[in-house]
């Protein structure tokens, strides 16, 4: 039975960039102590062309309570360090070695000594390199390192006797294990230099014998694993499985045990171990040894000092491995430790074992029950994360809906930027690109590569116990780690659903539901889930009863989608349960968490990226399982006619939980980084989350996060509101607003809730869906309906203290003025206009004007009225609605000054794109009114138009004179009209006789229309010209 599950933690997965912010490169030179640093530009110095990025990785707990991660590259020439707590914002340090390590990571040691990382490595050229990196440099933003930070020396000729294992004993002493089986001590003599010390053995003489006899290396019995006991004894295991104990005070071998002879296995099954590795683990005085017998054997023993003061090894028991013989598993790491919080009846010691087969890994825990070492049990783990187990989900969405953009977003959210970009790079290198009508095929290829890349990135390298007992697996790819989390009861049920284990009534009930649900397609389950959301959001009308809603779900989603025999099996099995009791147990004891307070936890005082990721990923796993169970339980109410009076409260609670679970899962897909920020802020004293050191603290904290999720209000959900504020109000350009609309807002906003519908309209607008946005903005009288119901962050926009640049500030500020309706639609019109949606801008400004006329009793500021009219005019001009333009100009004298009206008329009369149509409209309207004996324009406007038209006369163009003549004639200014024609005659010296005659006749006809002879005259400057004068001039042509 699997009791632990795996949580993958890529430390960069919550960020847009696939590499950390700050990378520093240090170069070790053979010639001099190079203190110069080269700051990295874009990535670490060894981007990964192969599936994995390093030959080894591990993580050390330092004296400042920080964890430092290190990676040794696959070529053994690059050493990389980064902080576990904040790999993205912290500093990544790359140290470039002058030569490769002699034997990969086995001739490398890293320890903390006096606030420094002390790194020792034997290079292939036989030199011994020492690095000293201050912790203050590792955890600061500084990119310079003062003083001597590396030293190269040759304390021994390692080209003669080749080392294959370097072991750290103390800051002053290390042990080199040689290929010929010998041991060599390296002692620091002056704080810098080392001198060799030979152990009292005959390995050197044996090596000479082999050299002259030309014996092969297979004759050697080299050390393959080593542990230090009480800082005095070396406990070593050799290739031939001899356990040897060396006394470091005398450099002599004091014990030599043949481990194979102490096993019950057939010695003929023994195979020599060639490679150095983790075959020993020591806790207090208990030693465990992995022996290569049969399918693997763990020998348990104790180290004790006998009466003569000699350290001895006492055999206790042999425990076979618990591995299937169908695969070849090799050991990665093993850690013997005190009992973990595994919820077992008895425990004396735990052995954590990490295996590997290809790129797959397996973690097991051997629980030794008591001191006899005879009673034990194997505890298994789920060795794939829930994300991996559900990896088919995203492509189903793409395949069925054809929504390629959503498919991309889902995949990138699931795998993170680093893995996503690596997968795209692989496809590009293989000439696989997205072509027209081949989107789904490309996404299928991308998903396959993503899985492979993620598997390679997560290949296990070592184990670190985080805090007191939390199992952290370090992966070969930098920034990739996995944590094995102790399962809750519900998680245990989920992961062991297909096991033969008998459990409680609730477990049997859930297994029954899961059996039927597994016969339905993912499409059917998704459609049912969406319908359950519709019940909460109001998409299904509230006027329908619960039974009617479930009937609708059955007909639309389930009818003809299952086998009747499967339904009968489900019905028969459900009859064996007391369902109300089982549901009470599920909801109240397993799903709904207890009450937690921030003071129950140790709040972190600074950001910790690792714990943030682990917290969110653990919550995501829990909610995913809760969501699946909740959906399956609700499904039974759709299938069977259950009494809603008995189950009404259960249904209501489950629908509420389903909504909140589904919302958080979609927010997780939308933006993990933002969701983590919200969760940590709401659950800790200083908004940075909490520190946890054991499984009990971790599980309790996840339960507290779950409590925050389940206790959140649906109508004003804090998680939903925070995402809305970030995506719509703050509107940072890098955020995918359209994905937010489709993934979060559309499915989850509450219909018939004025505030949420107003917010939905804002989101539609931000996505460019202006027609839908306008429609939603018309649903309610928002300035009245929601003015005192706005969530805090929208209320803040109305404050004078708000200094942000949100496009929504001015719109929301209209709620605070008396004339809020006209102001609201004016600002809404401006928003549409600025986004090139003039059609809806015009509709909004028209409604604004309507409200101004309707609410005449509400006084509007003069400045507002002017701006409103100007905006209205601009939109009318845009659509060439010149009749309406003239109405606004002639009726808006109270709002528009003479200067403003003049500017508009000047634009319309002088700009070629408007002048012809506008002037013809003006003449038509003037003519229509003159027939009734009225003037269309006010006198002041007539003067403005006349003045503008008169300005054009300087050109001498006949059309300009004709326009002014016509305008004056239609506005009862006949004498002035005649004068403009006479002015034209005088200006045109070379005017032909025929046109000049026509002009004279027109002037004469105008003057002839005056009844009195005393009125038959015009002015030419200060001179009076009579009708008689004009006739004489005409005769003189």
Swiss-Prot record:
GO cellular component: a single term: nuclear membrane
Functional description taken from the UniProt entry: Functions as a component of the nuclear pore complex (NPC). NPC components, collectively referred to as nucleoporins (NUPs), can play the role of both NPC structural components and of docking or interaction partners for transiently associated nuclear transport factors. NUP120 is involved in nuclear poly(A)+ RNA and pre-ribosome export, in GSP1 nuclear import, in NPC assembly and distribution, as well as in nuclear envelope organization.
Record PTM Phosphothreonine, positions in chain: 417
Official protein name in the record: Nucleoporin NUP120
MF annotations from Gene Ontology: identical protein binding; structural constituent of nuclear pore
Topology term for the membrane: Peripheral membrane protein
Endpoints of the signal sequence: none
TM annotation in the entry: none
Any matching Pfam family: Beta-prop_Nup120_160
Summary of subunit composition and partner proteins: Component of the nuclear pore complex (NPC). NPC constitutes the exclusive means of nucleocytoplasmic transport. NPCs allow the passive diffusion of ions and small molecules and the active, nuclear transport receptor-mediated bidirectional transport of macromolecules such as proteins, RNAs, ribonucleoparticles (RNPs), and ribosomal subunits across the nuclear envelope. Due to its 8-fold rotational symmetry, all subunits are present with 8 copies or multiples thereof.
Region (Leucine-zipper 2): 290-311
Name of the coding gene: NUP120
Main location: nucleus
GO BP annotations listed: double-strand break repair; mRNA export from nucleus; mRNA export from nucleus in response to heat stress; negative regulation of transcription by RNA polymerase II; nuclear pore localization; nucleocytoplasmic transport; positive regulation of DNA-templated transcription; positive regulation of transcription by RNA polymerase II
Region Leucine-zipper 1, annotated ranges: 131-152
Lineage: Eukaryota, Fungi, Dikarya, Ascomycota, Saccharomycotina
Keywords tagged on the record: Coiled coil, Membrane, mRNA transport, Nuclear pore complex, Nucleus, Phosphoprotein, Protein transport, Translocation, Transport
Localisation per UniProt entry: Nucleus, Nuclear pore complex; Nucleus membrane
